[in-house]
Amino acid sequence: MQVSKSYAWRGAGKETRKNSPLLPSNIRGLIIGKSNCGKTTAMMNLLLQKDWLDYELLHVFGKSLHQREYKILRKGLESGLSKAQISNIFENQDALNIDPVKLIEIYLDQGGTADGKIKANFYSDCSSQVPDPTELNELQKNLLILDDCLLEKQAKAEAYYTRGRHNNCDTFYISQNYFRLPRQTIRENSNLIILFPQDSKNIAHIHADHCTDIDIKEFKDFCNAVWRVRYNFVTIDLTSSKLNGKYRENFDNFYFPNT
């Protein structure tokens, strides 16, 4: 029998997401690192830079929504600003002499245009308010972010790593600790891992979980070389081979293992 792909039901809208070619077409991502290492900045780059993440409805759950970056993002998206308009605020922050949230209010009050189409919901409750993936509209390009939700029950978060792709939802879990994440659901089903500095023991465990196609010493040397530059991070794209971008410095500087 010749196996035909026609018998895999694609569904309307599910093939229209166009993330960057440097990212998986459907993302189950982890961003891991200690406090103040740059995790939120990396997430904002993915959210706001042109042609990286393709999404129409953003859901953010977390205990860190008081951070200035999230306040600006929330105000911008809820006010109808586009990615480019919100990016412009971040890129020109040194020239601002006013609170950026207030700036958005003044801009709109004075007749400024808001040409964004992304809808967004922000919640400080990481457990009861997280919808089941089946509750999402699969015809929309959904993006879910779980930030610092490790102390809450993980059942709903786990569902996005096992069933989220069936409901047209990309997911990022931002956490200070990789090994406290559920192994058989979140860790083993992740396909994009962004790592900020880790100690030698943690590097060894991550290598054992995902990176046995590279020598452990070479992997440690690669990670430590990347992390010598402050705020740099290692990207591991588990949908790519080691000779086609699995290992990277930041998002787009490929590393080709010698082993």
List each model region and its residues.
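An amphipathic, basic-hydrophobic helix/alpha-beta surface used to engage anionic
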Residues: 58
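Short, flexible N-terminal segments of the mature chain
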Residues: 77-85, 254-259
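Aromatic-Pro/Gly-enriched surface loop or interdomain linker
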Residues: 83-90, 95
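A generic structural signal for short, non-catalytic loop/turn and secondary-structure boundary residues
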Residues: 24, 137-139, 226-229
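Pre-Walker A adenine-sensing motif
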Residues: 3-23, 44-47
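Conserved P-loop NTPase motor cores
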Residues: 15-17, 27-37, 41-53, 63-74, ...
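Conserved GTP-binding G-domain of TRAFAC-class P-loop NTPases and closely related GTPase folds
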Residues: 183-259
